[in-house]
Design a protein with these regions (language model features):
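Early extracytoplasmic/lumenal segment of secretory-pathway proteins
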Residues: 6-70
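Conserved C-terminal helix/tail region of periplasmic/extracytoplasmic solute-binding proteins
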Residues: 292-317
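A ligand-binding cleft/hinge motif common to bilobed small-molecule-binding domains
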Residues: 66-73, 194, 199-218
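Mature extracytoplasmic/periplasmic domains
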Residues: 238-296
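Periplasmic-binding protein-like
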Residues: 88-91, 106, 171-176, 182, ...
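Short, low-complexity disordered leader/linker segments with a strong preference
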Residues: 1-10, 317
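A bilobed periplasmic-binding-protein/Venus flytrap-type ligand-binding module shared by bacterial periplasmic
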Residues: 109-116, 154-159, 231-244, 254, ...
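Extracytoplasmic ligand-binding site segments that recognize negatively charged/polar headgroups
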Residues: 14-22, 58-197
Protein backbone atom coordinates (compact mmCIF):
# COMPACT_ATOMS: atom_id res chain seq x y z
CA UNK A 1 0.00 0.00 0.00
CA UNK A 2 1.41 3.39 -0.94
CA UNK A 3 1.58 6.11 1.68
CA UNK A 4 -0.96 8.07 -0.38
CA UNK A 5 -3.45 5.19 -0.26
CA UNK A 6 -2.96 4.90 3.50
CA UNK A 7 -4.54 8.29 4.15
CA UNK A 8 -7.26 8.32 1.50
CA UNK A 9 -10.90 7.32 1.38
CA UNK A 10 -12.91 7.53 -1.83
CA UNK A 11 -16.49 8.76 -1.44
CA UNK A 12 -19.00 8.67 -4.27
CA UNK A 13 -21.46 11.59 -4.32
CA UNK A 14 -19.74 13.99 -1.89
CA UNK A 15 -20.18 17.30 -3.76
CA UNK A 16 -18.76 20.28 -1.84
CA UNK A 17 -21.73 22.50 -2.73
CA UNK A 18 -24.30 19.99 -1.48
CA UNK A 19 -25.20 19.76 2.23
CA UNK A 20 -21.90 21.54 3.00
CA UNK A 21 -19.81 18.46 2.22
CA UNK A 22 -17.05 21.02 1.51
CA UNK A 23 -16.76 21.88 5.22
CA UNK A 24 -17.24 18.24 6.24
CA UNK A 25 -14.42 16.96 3.97
CA UNK A 26 -12.03 19.62 5.34
CA UNK A 27 -12.95 18.66 8.92
CA UNK A 28 -12.40 14.95 8.16
CA UNK A 29 -8.92 15.74 6.78
CA UNK A 30 -8.03 17.98 9.74
CA UNK A 31 -9.28 15.66 12.49
CA UNK A 32 -8.53 12.20 11.05
CA UNK A 33 -5.77 12.85 8.49
CA UNK A 34 -7.89 11.11 5.85
CA UNK A 35 -8.17 12.94 2.52
CA UNK A 36 -11.54 12.46 0.83
CA UNK A 37 -11.61 13.91 -2.70
CA UNK A 38 -14.82 15.72 -3.65
CA UNK A 39 -17.12 13.88 -6.06
CA UNK A 40 -20.02 15.36 -8.01
CA UNK A 41 -22.02 12.27 -8.97
CA UNK A 42 -25.70 12.25 -8.03
CA UNK A 43 -27.25 9.30 -6.16
CA UNK A 44 -28.26 7.39 -9.31
CA UNK A 45 -24.88 7.91 -10.98
CA UNK A 46 -23.07 6.75 -7.83
CA UNK A 47 -25.09 3.53 -7.63
CA UNK A 48 -24.67 2.79 -11.36
CA UNK A 49 -20.89 3.21 -11.06
CA UNK A 50 -20.71 0.93 -8.01
CA UNK A 51 -22.65 -1.77 -9.85
CA UNK A 52 -20.32 -1.40 -12.87
CA UNK A 53 -17.28 -1.69 -10.56
CA UNK A 54 -18.67 -4.53 -8.43
CA UNK A 55 -15.81 -6.90 -9.37
CA UNK A 56 -13.14 -4.31 -8.54
CA UNK A 57 -14.55 -1.55 -6.31
CA UNK A 58 -13.03 1.94 -6.39
CA UNK A 59 -15.12 3.68 -3.72
CA UNK A 60 -14.89 3.13 0.03
CA UNK A 61 -18.05 4.94 1.08
CA UNK A 62 -21.08 6.28 -0.75
CA UNK A 63 -23.61 8.95 0.20
CA UNK A 64 -27.06 8.97 -1.39
CA UNK A 65 -30.78 9.23 -0.87
CA UNK A 66 -32.22 6.45 1.27
CA UNK A 67 -33.99 4.64 -1.57
CA UNK A 68 -30.65 4.26 -3.38
CA UNK A 69 -29.15 2.77 -0.21
CA UNK A 70 -31.91 0.16 -0.18
CA UNK A 71 -31.28 -0.56 -3.90
CA UNK A 72 -27.51 -0.77 -3.33
CA UNK A 73 -28.14 -3.45 -0.69
CA UNK A 74 -30.28 -5.42 -3.18
CA UNK A 75 -27.49 -5.06 -5.77
CA UNK A 76 -24.95 -6.49 -3.32
CA UNK A 77 -22.51 -3.57 -3.56
CA UNK A 78 -22.49 -2.43 0.11
CA UNK A 79 -21.65 -4.13 3.38
CA UNK A 80 -22.82 -3.78 6.97
CA UNK A 81 -21.12 -1.49 9.48
CA UNK A 82 -22.58 -0.33 12.78
CA UNK A 83 -20.82 2.97 13.48
CA UNK A 84 -20.26 4.92 16.68
CA UNK A 85 -23.51 6.31 18.20
CA UNK A 86 -25.47 3.44 16.61
CA UNK A 87 -27.96 3.37 19.50
CA UNK A 88 -28.82 7.06 19.08
CA UNK A 89 -29.93 6.58 15.47
CA UNK A 90 -33.71 5.96 15.28
CA UNK A 91 -34.81 2.55 13.97
CA UNK A 92 -36.34 3.84 10.71
CA UNK A 93 -33.16 5.77 9.96
CA UNK A 94 -30.80 2.80 9.61
CA UNK A 95 -30.66 -0.64 8.05
CA UNK A 96 -30.71 -3.20 10.92
CA UNK A 97 -27.32 -4.56 9.79
CA UNK A 98 -25.82 -1.12 9.14
CA UNK A 99 -25.81 -1.51 5.35
CA UNK A 100 -26.95 2.13 5.26
CA UNK A 101 -27.19 4.69 8.05
CA UNK A 102 -28.89 8.09 7.87
CA UNK A 103 -26.73 11.17 8.44
CA UNK A 104 -29.40 13.85 8.18
CA UNK A 105 -32.74 14.55 6.57
CA UNK A 106 -34.22 17.20 4.35
CA UNK A 107 -37.78 18.36 3.71
CA UNK A 108 -38.93 18.90 0.12
CA UNK A 109 -40.49 22.21 -0.83
CA UNK A 110 -40.08 25.27 -3.02
CA UNK A 111 -36.82 27.20 -2.96
CA UNK A 112 -37.78 30.60 -4.36
CA UNK A 113 -35.53 33.42 -5.54
CA UNK A 114 -37.98 36.21 -4.67
CA UNK A 115 -36.08 38.83 -6.70
CA UNK A 116 -36.33 36.70 -9.86
CA UNK A 117 -40.15 36.32 -9.82
CA UNK A 118 -40.73 39.50 -11.83
CA UNK A 119 -43.41 40.65 -9.41
CA UNK A 120 -45.30 37.34 -9.25
CA UNK A 121 -46.24 36.21 -5.71
CA UNK A 122 -44.25 33.50 -3.93
CA UNK A 123 -46.11 30.24 -4.76
CA UNK A 124 -47.64 28.50 -1.73
CA UNK A 125 -49.00 25.23 -3.16
CA UNK A 126 -48.36 22.54 -5.76
CA UNK A 127 -51.37 23.91 -7.64
CA UNK A 128 -49.86 27.41 -7.71
CA UNK A 129 -46.93 26.12 -9.77
CA UNK A 130 -49.35 25.21 -12.59
CA UNK A 131 -50.42 28.85 -13.01
CA UNK A 132 -49.26 30.49 -16.26
CA UNK A 133 -47.59 33.37 -14.39
CA UNK A 134 -44.77 30.95 -13.47
CA UNK A 135 -44.02 29.92 -17.07
CA UNK A 136 -40.29 29.38 -17.59
CA UNK A 137 -39.57 29.92 -13.88
CA UNK A 138 -39.76 26.41 -12.39
CA UNK A 139 -36.94 23.91 -12.15
CA UNK A 140 -36.69 20.40 -10.74
CA UNK A 141 -33.93 17.81 -10.90
CA UNK A 142 -34.50 14.90 -13.26
CA UNK A 143 -36.85 12.58 -11.30
CA UNK A 144 -35.70 9.57 -13.34
CA UNK A 145 -32.08 9.98 -12.16
CA UNK A 146 -31.53 12.36 -9.22
CA UNK A 147 -32.91 11.36 -5.82
CA UNK A 148 -34.08 14.92 -5.09
CA UNK A 149 -36.14 14.78 -8.30
CA UNK A 150 -37.74 11.50 -7.27
CA UNK A 151 -38.49 12.93 -3.81
CA UNK A 152 -40.30 15.85 -5.45
CA UNK A 153 -42.37 13.33 -7.43
CA UNK A 154 -43.20 11.33 -4.29
CA UNK A 155 -44.10 14.54 -2.45
CA UNK A 156 -46.51 15.85 -5.08
CA UNK A 157 -47.93 12.35 -5.53
CA UNK A 158 -48.70 11.96 -1.79
CA UNK A 159 -50.06 15.53 -1.64
CA UNK A 160 -52.40 14.76 -4.54
CA UNK A 161 -53.77 11.54 -3.04
CA UNK A 162 -51.47 8.99 -4.67
CA UNK A 163 -49.38 6.30 -2.98
CA UNK A 164 -46.32 4.18 -3.76
CA UNK A 165 -48.44 1.80 -5.83
CA UNK A 166 -50.09 4.59 -7.83
CA UNK A 167 -48.11 7.50 -9.24
CA UNK A 168 -50.91 8.69 -11.53
CA UNK A 169 -51.45 11.94 -9.55
CA UNK A 170 -47.73 12.86 -9.87
CA UNK A 171 -47.59 11.99 -13.57
CA UNK A 172 -50.72 14.08 -14.20
CA UNK A 173 -49.21 17.00 -12.28
CA UNK A 174 -45.93 16.81 -14.23
CA UNK A 175 -47.91 16.64 -17.49
CA UNK A 176 -49.77 19.83 -16.57
CA UNK A 177 -46.52 21.46 -15.45
CA UNK A 178 -45.00 20.97 -18.92
CA UNK A 179 -47.16 23.87 -20.14
CA UNK A 180 -44.96 26.08 -17.93
CA UNK A 181 -41.81 24.85 -19.73
CA UNK A 182 -39.90 23.68 -16.63
CA UNK A 183 -36.10 23.51 -16.56
CA UNK A 184 -34.85 19.99 -15.69
CA UNK A 185 -31.15 19.78 -14.72
CA UNK A 186 -29.47 16.42 -13.93
CA UNK A 187 -27.33 17.65 -11.03
CA UNK A 188 -27.58 20.16 -8.20
CA UNK A 189 -28.86 23.50 -9.53
CA UNK A 190 -28.16 25.69 -6.49
CA UNK A 191 -26.05 28.26 -8.38
CA UNK A 192 -28.70 28.59 -11.09
CA UNK A 193 -31.33 29.41 -8.44
CA UNK A 194 -29.08 32.00 -6.77
CA UNK A 195 -28.34 33.66 -10.13
CA UNK A 196 -32.07 33.86 -10.89
CA UNK A 197 -31.84 31.65 -13.98
CA UNK A 198 -34.20 29.22 -12.21
CA UNK A 199 -36.44 31.37 -9.96
CA UNK A 200 -38.32 28.43 -8.35
CA UNK A 201 -36.59 25.12 -7.65
CA UNK A 202 -38.18 22.00 -6.13
CA UNK A 203 -35.55 21.37 -3.49
CA UNK A 204 -34.82 20.80 0.18
CA UNK A 205 -35.14 23.17 3.10
CA UNK A 206 -31.40 23.03 3.83
CA UNK A 207 -30.44 24.44 0.43
CA UNK A 208 -32.93 27.30 0.79
CA UNK A 209 -31.75 28.16 4.31
CA UNK A 210 -28.14 28.11 3.12
CA UNK A 211 -29.01 30.51 0.29
CA UNK A 212 -30.82 32.82 2.68
CA UNK A 213 -28.52 32.81 5.71
CA UNK A 214 -25.07 32.00 4.28
CA UNK A 215 -25.23 33.51 0.79
CA UNK A 216 -27.64 36.29 1.86
CA UNK A 217 -29.85 35.83 -1.18
CA UNK A 218 -33.49 36.94 -1.07
CA UNK A 219 -34.69 33.34 -0.98
CA UNK A 220 -37.88 31.97 0.58
CA UNK A 221 -38.57 28.35 1.47
CA UNK A 222 -42.16 27.16 1.14
CA UNK A 223 -43.63 23.94 2.53
CA UNK A 224 -46.57 23.55 0.12
CA UNK A 225 -49.98 23.72 1.72
CA UNK A 226 -51.15 20.35 0.34
CA UNK A 227 -48.21 18.67 2.11
CA UNK A 228 -44.77 17.27 1.40
CA UNK A 229 -42.27 14.60 2.52
CA UNK A 230 -39.10 14.45 4.61
CA UNK A 231 -36.36 12.01 3.60
CA UNK A 232 -33.01 10.93 4.99
CA UNK A 233 -29.72 10.89 3.15
CA UNK A 234 -27.60 7.92 4.13
CA UNK A 235 -24.03 6.63 3.98
CA UNK A 236 -22.78 3.10 3.29
CA UNK A 237 -19.51 1.21 3.40
CA UNK A 238 -18.78 -0.25 -0.05
CA UNK A 239 -18.42 -4.04 -0.21
CA UNK A 240 -14.76 -5.04 -0.76
CA UNK A 241 -13.74 -1.38 -0.49
CA UNK A 242 -10.04 -0.69 -1.20
CA UNK A 243 -9.60 1.25 2.10
CA UNK A 244 -12.28 -0.19 4.44
CA UNK A 245 -10.64 1.00 7.69
CA UNK A 246 -10.56 4.58 6.39
CA UNK A 247 -14.11 4.25 5.10
CA UNK A 248 -15.28 3.23 8.59
CA UNK A 249 -13.46 6.21 10.13
CA UNK A 250 -15.22 8.56 7.69
CA UNK A 251 -18.62 7.09 8.62
CA UNK A 252 -17.81 7.38 12.33
CA UNK A 253 -16.77 11.00 11.83
CA UNK A 254 -19.91 12.18 10.02
CA UNK A 255 -22.00 10.66 12.84
CA UNK A 256 -19.80 12.07 15.63
CA UNK A 257 -20.74 15.16 17.66
CA UNK A 258 -18.47 17.27 15.44
CA UNK A 259 -19.67 15.80 12.16
CA UNK A 260 -23.34 16.04 13.12
CA UNK A 261 -22.88 19.66 14.24
CA UNK A 262 -21.50 20.49 10.76
CA UNK A 263 -24.72 19.14 9.20
CA UNK A 264 -26.86 21.09 11.69
CA UNK A 265 -24.93 24.29 10.96
CA UNK A 266 -25.60 23.64 7.26
CA UNK A 267 -29.35 23.68 8.09
CA UNK A 268 -29.77 19.90 7.85
CA UNK A 269 -31.71 18.03 10.50
CA UNK A 270 -29.02 15.76 11.99
CA UNK A 271 -30.02 12.13 12.56
CA UNK A 272 -28.86 12.38 16.18
CA UNK A 273 -31.37 14.82 17.71
CA UNK A 274 -28.90 15.90 20.41
CA UNK A 275 -26.73 17.48 17.70
CA UNK A 276 -29.36 20.11 16.79
CA UNK A 277 -28.56 23.21 18.83
CA UNK A 278 -31.16 25.86 19.66
CA UNK A 279 -29.07 28.26 17.56
CA UNK A 280 -29.31 25.98 14.53
CA UNK A 281 -33.05 25.37 15.02
CA UNK A 282 -33.97 29.05 14.89
CA UNK A 283 -33.13 29.20 11.17
CA UNK A 284 -35.84 26.64 10.33
CA UNK A 285 -39.47 27.41 9.53
CA UNK A 286 -41.73 26.91 12.58
CA UNK A 287 -42.81 23.41 13.60
CA UNK A 288 -46.37 24.28 12.52
CA UNK A 289 -45.12 24.41 8.90
CA UNK A 290 -43.14 21.18 9.31
CA UNK A 291 -46.34 19.47 10.51
CA UNK A 292 -47.28 19.31 6.78
CA UNK A 293 -44.18 17.20 6.08
CA UNK A 294 -44.56 13.43 6.45
CA UNK A 295 -42.13 10.53 6.47
CA UNK A 296 -42.96 7.62 4.16
CA UNK A 297 -42.17 3.91 3.96
CA UNK A 298 -38.69 4.21 2.44
CA UNK A 299 -38.57 0.53 1.43
CA UNK A 300 -41.78 0.99 -0.58
CA UNK A 301 -40.36 4.22 -1.96
CA UNK A 302 -37.24 2.38 -3.11
CA UNK A 303 -39.28 -0.48 -4.58
CA UNK A 304 -41.42 1.95 -6.58
CA UNK A 305 -38.56 4.01 -7.98
CA UNK A 306 -37.72 1.99 -11.11
CA UNK A 307 -41.35 1.73 -12.20
CA UNK A 308 -41.90 5.44 -11.58
CA UNK A 309 -38.78 6.35 -13.58
CA UNK A 310 -39.93 4.23 -16.51
CA UNK A 311 -43.42 5.78 -16.37
CA UNK A 312 -41.97 9.30 -16.16
CA UNK A 313 -39.60 8.70 -19.08
CA UNK A 314 -42.34 7.26 -21.28
CA UNK A 315 -45.07 9.78 -20.44
CA UNK A 316 -43.28 13.06 -19.69
CA UNK A 317 -40.24 13.08 -21.92
Amino acid sequence: MTSHAADTAICYNCPPEWADWGTQLKAIAKDTGIQVPQDNKNSGQALAQMVAEKGNPVADVVYYGVSFGIQADSAGVITGYQPAHWDEIPAGMKDPDGKWVALHSGTMGFMVNVDALGGAPVPQSWDDLLKPEYKGMIGYLDPASAFVGYVAAVAVNQAKGGNMQDFTPAINWFKKLQANQPIVPKQTAYARLISGEIPILLDYDFNAYRAKYKDHANVAFVIPKEGTVTVPYVISLVKNAPHPANGKKVIDYVLSDKGQAIWANAFLRPVRPSAMSADAKKFFLPDSDYARAQTVDYQQMADAQKAFSAKYLSEIR
